[in-house]
């Protein structure tokens, strides 16, 4: 992009004709429309839902004692080996009850395409897309394979018994070494030449709306053994089964699903994929390749959207950006608490004059004029604390400034530079790596490691000990990838300019830019 390219006060003059994948694959909301749909869900629903739910619950609880009998009396040593050939009559009973339970929910027919490979050929099954809590029905089609689950789930009635029944691999969030043990156990079972039952993974790690494939996590691929991709499709006229991070709740999805006469489900087994030597050595590359194969078969985009903690994120170059910036949430709760944006400039001036730097909870409440303890605590906890439990008030001022829809993207970038730049020995104002990280952390929530990669990329083109104001503004306004952050992503919702960052399939930046090979800025 040259200096002559039109850049308006609030963003580019045009959207460059770029298309992005759906903005939020973690969002799905469905409401019945029309007379027939409303009749189905609100007239048939009160009849079908209670009956189906009750019958499904009965068959679920019938599995409890049978699953417990499978492992009753077995020692830890015996359970460390496969018990797939022991007490097989109980396995068949659980299989029958499982299929009946899903039948009661409305899954009367399951269309199966392809052939499931035996454990000796494909010790691991990877299933996608993961779009609903009904997806475990695939375990019935796959003859009740083992799964990876949290150890806390052992304490859930019925579920815990079923996890013990199929010798699931358990991971503990409290044990730092647990993930390493899980990896070793997956490798041990996967290389047992079919002695153990197959291990089934949902490699996306969470539910999406099914319109794209989320980023595959490498856990299913660390063993470096062949895997069999398994596709799930719900070819129904109404997307009632989908349950995502944000949207229809559990009860509503159950009601909408069980109010239909029946639910269509297709499960397709793709050919077993044998990794190359390079892919065996790199689980991330292996996961990427399998994701691409499954995406092509589904005719859906393969993306790097993922859920980190409780935050849905999308990739933009070296950064992982929250789909819904938390700074708008902070602005909303402060507004409800009576805080006015009219006072922001005064707070900014104090920071520029060096009057205030680090503040505690009480001092933050005093400066913002907010007395509600719960509100000020949420705001305070958003920012990084130092060893003394203090936060940088410059970060607070920058976040508050971003709430102002009248402030242009360029003005916000210049303010960020002024707040966090320092003078070098020659008196030049420069933005250091730490200052750059503080800007991205406060506005985007980006970890320092990610910010450091971006800074290193930009710093390559200068001999100074940091970025000049012009260099930082070019990054914010004209960089072929990251400009979308300041021009669109960080525009307040009230400005009407809020858009997702332009994201390509499988991550990267918009246009022709690859996150690993960014072109030099103009």
From Swiss-Prot:
Q: What membrane topology does this protein have?
A: Multi-pass membrane protein
What name does UniProt use for this protein?
Answer: Lysophospholipid acyltransferase LPCAT4
Q: What does this protein do?
A: Displays acyl-CoA-dependent lysophospholipid acyltransferase activity with a subset of lysophospholipids as substrates. Prefers long chain acyl-CoAs (C16, C18) as acyl donors.
Stretch list, region Disordered: 496-522
Q: Where is this motif: HXXXXD motif?
A: 130-135
Segments crossing the lipid bilayer: 43-63, 92-112
The record's top EC class is transferase
């Amino acid at each position: 992009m040259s200096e002559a390219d039109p850049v308006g006060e609030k963003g580019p003059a045009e959207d460059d004709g770029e298309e992005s994948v759906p903005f939020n694959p973690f969002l799905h909301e469905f409401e019945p429309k029309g007379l027939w749909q409303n009749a189905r869900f609100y007239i048939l629903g009160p009849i079908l839902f209670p009956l189906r739910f009750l019958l499904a619950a009965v068959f679920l609880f019938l599995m409890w004692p049978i699953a417990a009998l499978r492992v009753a009396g077995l020692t830890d040593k015996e359970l460390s080996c496969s018990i797939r050939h022991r007490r097989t009559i109980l396995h068949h009973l659980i299989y029958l009850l499982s299929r009946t339970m899903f039948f009661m929910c409305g899954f009367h027919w399951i269309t199966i395409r392809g052939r499931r490979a035996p454990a000796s050929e494909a010790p691991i099954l990877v299933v996608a897309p993961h779009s609903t809590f009904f997806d475990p029905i695939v375990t019935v089609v796959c003859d009740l394979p083992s799964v990876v689950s949290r150890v806390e789930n052992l304490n859930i009635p019925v579920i815990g018994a079923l996890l013990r029944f199929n010798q699931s691999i358990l991971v503990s969030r409290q044990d730092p070494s647990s993930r390493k043990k899980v990896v070793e156990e997956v490798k041990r079972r996967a290389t047992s030449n079919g002695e153990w039952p197959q291990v089934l993974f949902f490699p996306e790690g969470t539910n999406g709306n099914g319109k794209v494939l989320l980023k595959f996590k490498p856990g299913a691929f660390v063993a470096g053994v062949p895997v069999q991709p398994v596709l799930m499709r719900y070819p129904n006229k109404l997307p009632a089964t989908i349950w995502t991070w944000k949207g229809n709740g559990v009860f509503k999805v159950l009601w909408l699903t069980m109010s239909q006469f029946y639910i269509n489900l297709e499960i397709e087994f793709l050919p077993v994929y044998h990794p190359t030597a390079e892919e065996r050595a790199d689980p991330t590359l292996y996961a990427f390749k399998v994701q691409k194969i499954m995406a092509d078969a589904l005719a859906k985009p393969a993306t790097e959207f993922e859920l980190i903690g409780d935050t849905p994120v999308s990739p933009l170059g070296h950064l992982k950006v929250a789909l819904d910036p938390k700074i708008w949430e902070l602005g909303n709760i402060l507004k409800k608490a009576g805080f006015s944006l009219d006072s922001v400039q005064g707070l900014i001036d104090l920071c520029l004059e060096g009057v205030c730097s680090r503040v505690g909870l009480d001092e933050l409440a005093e400066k913002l004029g907010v007395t509600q303890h719960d509100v000020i605590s949420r705001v305070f906890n958003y920012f990084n604390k130092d060893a003394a439990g203090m936060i940088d008030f410059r970060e607070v001022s920058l976040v508050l400034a971003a709430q102002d829809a009248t402030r242009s993207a360029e003005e916000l970038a210049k303010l960020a530079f002024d707040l966090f730049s320092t003078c070098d020995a020659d008196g030049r104002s420069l933005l250091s790596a730490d200052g750059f990280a503080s800007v991205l952390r406060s506005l985007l929530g980006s970890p320092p490691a990610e910010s450091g990669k971006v800074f290193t990329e930009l710093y390559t083109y200068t001999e100074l000990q940091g970025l000049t104001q012009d260099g930082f503004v070019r990054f914010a306004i004209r960089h072929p990838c990251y400009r979308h952050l300041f021009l669109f992503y960080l525009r307040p919702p009230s400005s009407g300019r809020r858009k997702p960052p332009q994201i390509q399939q499988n991550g990267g930046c918009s246009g022709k830019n690859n996150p690993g090979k960014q072109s030099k800025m103009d």
